[in-house]
Structure formats: C-alpha cells, structure tokens
Design a protein with these regions (language model features):
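Histidine-centered catalytic micro-motifs
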Residues: 8-19, 133-139, 195, 246-248
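Short helix-capping segments at alpha-helix termini
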Residues: 60-68, 163-167, 188-189, 283-284
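Mid-to-C-terminal alpha-helical segments outside catalytic/metal-binding sites
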Residues: 272-346
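Short, acidic/polar
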Residues: 19-26, 80-91
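Divalent metal-dependent hydrolysis catalytic cores, especially in the metallo-beta-lactamase
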Residues: 11-12, 25-50, 66-78, 94-108, ...
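Histidine/acidic residue-rich metal-binding segments in metalloenzymes
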Residues: 84-100, 108-244
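His/Asp/Glu-enriched, well-ordered alpha-helical/loop segment
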Residues: 163, 235-304
C-alpha cells in the first residue's frame, strides 16, 4: 500500500499557548487538522466567555489563509466558576467544553479544582445541557507516586463523578494506563478517552535510559511498556470510545532543557505521519481513520469532516525538522524512536 485517503483529522486536545508561541505553533496544527479543542491553561487562565472569544480571535489571526480550521474553545473550571455564566457561554456557542484540572496536576494548573464535590452543582448543570467535561485524570497528593496518579484518580475521583452523573459527557484525556483503558471500555457511552501520539510511541524508558530526555517528559508521565501496549491496543482496535487528542504542548527549548524542566511534548508537526506508522506497524491501518477522524466526532456528537487528506508511504524514512523558531529561541519537534515512512500529501 503506497497511499491511503482518510477523512481530515481532528485534534481533540491542543495547547496553542499565546503571543509568539501561538503564532509559531498554530500553523503546525491547522495544516493537518480541521478542528481542535483548545486548552484554557494560559497565564492567566481562560475563565469566562469573553476571555475565550478574545483568545479564539488571536488563534484565528494565526491560521494561514490556505487552511480551513475551527478552534473549539474551553473554560478552565475552578471552584468559583459561575454555572449560570457557563451555561450562557455554552448556549451562545462561545465555548465548547469545560476543562477540569486538579490543582497542581500539570502546566499552569494551580487555579484548578481541589475538591471535586465543590464543583458538582456545575457538573450537574453541564449534564443537563449536554456540555462536555474534559478531565486531566491525575491526583496531586504529594505522597502519591507519580506513576500511580492516574489509576488513583480513576478509583477516587472519576468513578464518583461517573456514578453520580452517568448522563454527563466526559472525556478522560491523554490516558496512559491499562486501568484507564479497562475503565473506559466498561463505562457507559458518555465516557470516552483521548490518547496522544507520544504515549503510543514511548514508554518510561524513553525518558531515563541513556541519559535524561527532557523533550520526552510530559504529564501524565510515560508509563511501563505493558501500559503502552494497552493504550496502543485501544487506539488500533477501532473502539469508538478512544480517539486522538495530541496534547501537543509547546515549550521553548531553554524551558525544557534545565534543572527543573517543563512538562510537555510538541508533536503537532508530524503527528499524523507517526500515527500512520504505528497503525501500520500493528497491521491496523484500516482503523487509523476511526481513531483520527471519526470516533471523536461521534463522542462529541458533531458531524465528521467532509474534507479528506492523503497519506503517502515513502521508500525512505521521512526527515523530521528538529525545531520551529520562536523569536530568538525555538521549540523542539517530537521525533519518535522508530523510522516513519508516511507523509501527508499537500
């Protein structure tokens, strides 16, 4: 097989940041994707419709004229969020979903939720109007091992939300464990999960073996190979509960390569090529389109895209650019630990 055609993909989890970084990274996503859910964890975070609309306008200015792209905006959930303002924001079309960050779980999440029960009235309202809840599924207790934070969040927090509000549309984002895969499979139809290309490609050895690899450091952190295999099987299965959310997360090189480096992998540039290679390696190319282009739209109950893209398999591995420029600095581009032969044709 030399070429395949798929429905133009969607990225159901993207970080565009702001200002110079935003202008540099937006075209890397809009080249290959039709829609993206945009994360709200800026400094300061996106807390209301007015801020979301202003942020969307900044994103739209950075989209190349040749690309047709729709940013889907989110609001950062806090214990002070006004549920009536949130309802108006959703009903007006200004906001697509709400993001729940446990306080301190990841980049710019200090304003997040400390007590799930305090936001339950907001979640009840969201269930009533059909507004999706996006969850960074990790506990943040300092005594909890970082490799166990997703599993414990599912047991202690997610299960409570799902059982209390089974009608709430929930996405457990960037899953990394076999426990997450099993929980999502067994849950009702309103719970889905996004999976990133770097969690499909790497395990925790890829951070530590042969020296620290700061550009493979992300949150949730990479897990054991057995967990990677579990999420790969979920992604390639065609099961419509699992879909692509790249969690592409740009940081300047100097903010990654230091004594306390930032968490995040910038994977937008070659995401689709990497996924095609992974699916081919597992003899599952027939399910690539479901994962990248169909399952997410089904979960969010919106129409799938009408445009298509063509992927071509080259005779030699494609050459990845190492970085993209941002002013005097740059952002390192994710490159997996295997050859990639698939190219997206323009």
């Amino acid at each position: 097989m030399k070429e395949i055609e798929i429905i133009k993909p969607d990225d159901w989890h993207v970080h565009f940041r702001d200002n110079e970084i935003l202008n540099a990274v937006v075209p890397e996503t809009t080249r290959h994707f039709a829609r993206s859910i945009v994360m709200p964890n800026l400094i300061p975070p996106i807390l209301n419709a007015k801020q979301a609309i202003e942020y969307r306008k900044r994103i739209e200015k950075a989209i190349p004229k040749s690309d047709h792209f729709q940013p889907l905006m989110t609001i950062y959930l806090t214990e002070e969020t006004n549920k009536y303002e949130l309802k108006d924001a959703y009903n007006s079309g200004a906001v697509f979903a709400v993001k729940l960050y446990p306080a301190g779980a990841t980049t710019n999440s200090d304003s997040g939720v400390k007590d799930i029960k305090k936001v339950m009235p907001i979640l009840e309202m969201m269930a009533e109007i059909g507004m999706p809840l996006l969850i960074h599924g990790e506990v943040t207790d300092k005594e909890i091992d970082i490799f166990d934070r997703e599993k414990i969040f599912i047991d202690q927090k997610l299960d409570f939300i799902c059982n209390t509000l089974p009608e709430l549309k929930i996405t457990l984002e960037h899953i990394t464990t076999s426990e997450a895969v099993s929980y999502v499979k067994e849950a009702n139809k309103n719970l889905g999960a996004s999976i990133t290309p770097h969690h499909l490609a790497l395990n925790r050895n890829d951070i530590f073996v042969g020296g620290i690899k700061p550009h493979n450091y992300c949150l949730p952190i990479l897990k054991r190979e057995v967990h990677r295999q579990s999420i790969v099987q979920a992604a390639i299965s065609g099961n419509n509960k699992f879909f692509l959310g790249t969690d592409t997360a740009p940081h300047l090189k100097e903010h990654k390569e230091n004594s306390c480096g930032c968490a995040g992998v910038f994977n937008a540039s070659y995401c689709i090529s990497i996924l095609a290679q992974i699916f081919e390696n597992y003899e599952s190319l027939d399910n690539l389109e479901k994962f990248t282009s169909i399952n997410g739209a089904l979960h969010y109950q919106i129409p799938r895209n009408t445009k298509k893209i063509i992927l071509k398999k080259e005779n030699e591995p494609i050459l990845f650019k190492t970085s993209i420029s941002v002013g005097p600095s740059n952002i390192v581009v994710f490159n997996p630990n295997f050859p990639v032969f698939w190219n997206v044709k323009n």
